[in-house]
């Protein structure tokens, strides 16, 4: 690498040429050279998934794509790592990237045991005494980036952060797929380029409705690099009684290797054998019809509510707010006392969000004003349903919102549809999330 986070200039071109004159075997990367002279690798940082695919699909792309920095693993993060690796595995020219970064760089404030003592050997009281600090923890006046030095795959105590498990899964080099659940045939793909799977064993277990019922091991795997072999997992199909059944597969080291011990799991898969059905047959028909027609009453204006009732269902919508005020089935409240359902455009900001100050940039969406304009109620006697459409004006975000409640009297089900219409060209920030 010629450097990081600087600019492009003639000195870097000369440095590139000098390196090539000394050693023609090694590729050179430099992010600011982009796709031109001075690099052998197109190595952008934080390149969007869509841009990566566009580059990978372009037959004129001049060099391999390896992001010099990506997957900013700060706090709750790494959710789209699979999107990148689906493309890496699809396009040979896209060859991965370098995570930012390895470890949270927080500092010990109080050391109760040497770092050679693993945290799991400490008791809870000792663990609570261990403190890690970052910018702002020492005083209020020194310049600080707060916790922006804590963006690692592992913690400052060298224990795995939650997102480390996603990184490990996406980077694993052995993959299993179900070929036939009836016969137990599973394909095993060795994604390694230079080694076979002779030092790995396949451990399997059958899980029925969350309980392990069968297990075993295939000790010898004969799969060359970049090849696939099919194995038969010897579970007894005749003994399966569960409604939801999974085949869990682990690939484990038979002998120790550098940094890894014998028996360590290096790859895994969970494959469906029997899938649980939400309903038998036509789910849409079952949602509407249930097990027979129920007598329904509709009171559209009484007590300032829209009320739909059957022997099993009580559904009420508040005419002053346009929102559900009560939903009970067989006498049990589905919302709890004072509960309601309302549109939501927010979620808890993550560390990465706060690094970009999105909690302030998007704050208009946290609790935007919703002015009720109209309520429309229609009863369909033939279908035994009631459709309620509430319309809102949302001036702070320059949009309109329609919420449709389709009440199925026969089953007590309520289908809710939100339709937000933004004003084209309006200067409104993005939102974190749209839901209810």
Task: Identify the residue ranges that each predicted region occupies.
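A short beta-turn/strand-edge loop motif at beta-sheet boundaries
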Residues: 193-200, 241, 426-430
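Solvent-exposed, conformationally flexible loop/turn segments
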Residues: 179-181, 223-228, 301-303
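Short, well-ordered beta-strand segments enriched in hydrophobic/aromatic residues
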Residues: 184-190, 308, 312, 390, ...
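Acidic-aromatic substrate-binding/catalytic surfaces of carbohydrate-active enzymes
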Residues: 261-262, 266-268, 304-395
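Terminal connector regions
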Residues: 237-283
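Acidic (Asp/Glu-rich), glycine- and aromatic
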Residues: 250, 264-270, 320-322, 399-401, ...
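Extended substrate-binding grooves/exosites of carbohydrate-active enzymes
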Residues: 1-187, 192-213
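Intrinsically disordered, low-complexity Pro/Gly/Ser/Thr-rich segments with frequent PxxP/GP/PP motifs
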Residues: 201, 207-243, 251
